[in-house]
Regions:
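Extreme N-terminal, non-catalytic leader segments
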Residues: 1-8
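RNA pseudouridine synthases
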Residues: 105, 117-124
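ATP-dependent small-molecule kinase phosphotransfer cores
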Residues: 46-110
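Glycine-rich phosphate-binding P-loop
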Residues: 12-26
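Conserved phosphate-donor/acceptor-positioning beta-strand/loop module used by diverse small-molecule
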Residues: 124-147, 151-160
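Small-molecule kinase domains that catalyze NTP-dependent phosphoryl transfer to phosphate-bearing small molecules
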Residues: 62-71, 151-195
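NTP-dependent small-molecule kinase module
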Residues: 25, 100-103, 172-215
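Short beta-strand-centered segment that lines the nucleotide-binding/catalytic pocket of NTP-utilizing
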Residues: 34-47
Length: 215
């Protein structure tokens, strides 16, 4: 279907507890024998930029604690801030380098990316499938309780905090609403469909969309 594009990417956006990254993304990577990029992307962005991986990791953690993403936007436009600029190691530029790596990787390999606003970063690429995975709140709470061995209150706090961060992060870097279905090619309820069935369904869509190249 896309003869000029030998590789494909699946960009997964997910709510906490839905299993979109911790299960579905990992299983898809195994099925197709390709890499899954999440925090692993920080190392590649560090190598590409010359900025230490520790700074990327610190920025990744700090954004979970800051109010910045709730009050402003820095929509990604593909630009890179040069080393001589005082903003070279700003959170904005660290995101820019992660985005740059994602775009360049698509010329070298197929991969799964979880989060990182990858659906927006790769929005002009025809060889990308964007997927949103969600599930009812109570189901997600129960799943996190079992997965982490924690109580209901802790699970709710964990989910609420992480979902709020992801929503604000996405809005800050894309200017778009995180849960708008029109942002994605495929939207799945992992509770209604089942985690393994989600994997099989996405696998089938990949094979259909990319005309057998992914087999």
């Amino acid at each position: 279907m896309y003869p000029d594009y030998p590789y494909f990417a699946v960009a997964i956006t997910r709510t906490c507890g839905s299993g979109g990254g911790s299960y579905i993304g990992k299983q898809l990577a195994k099925v197709f024998d390709i890499d899954l990029y999440d925090r692993k992307l920080l190392r590649l962005a560090s190598e590409d930029s010359g900025i230490s991986e520790e700074l990327f990791a610190r920025a990744d953690e700090n954004t979970r604690k800051t109010m910045l993403y709730r009050v402003s936007e820095r929509v990604y436009d593909g630009s890179i801030i040069p080393p001589e600029s005082g903003n070279f190691i700003s959170d904005e530029n660290l995101f820019n380098y992660q985005a740059k790596v994602l775009r360049e990787l698509l010329n070298e390999e197929s991969y799964i990316c979880v989060g990182r606003a990858a659906d927006f970063v790769l929005r002009d690429k025809p060889n990308v499938l964007t997927v949103y995975v969600d599930a009812p709140y109570d189901w997600r709470v129960e799943r996190e309780m079992k997965r982490q061995g924690i109580g209901s209150g802790q699970a709710k706090h964990y989910i609420d905090k992480l979902d709020r961060y992801r929503e604000n992060y996405y809005k800050y870097h894309t200017g778009r609403q995180w849960k708008r279905v029109e942002n994605y090619d495929l939207c799945l309820d992992s509770a209604a469909i089942g985690l393994d069935n989600c994997v099989e369904l996405i696998k089938k869509v990949i094979e259909l969309k990319f005309d057998g190249k992914a087999k």
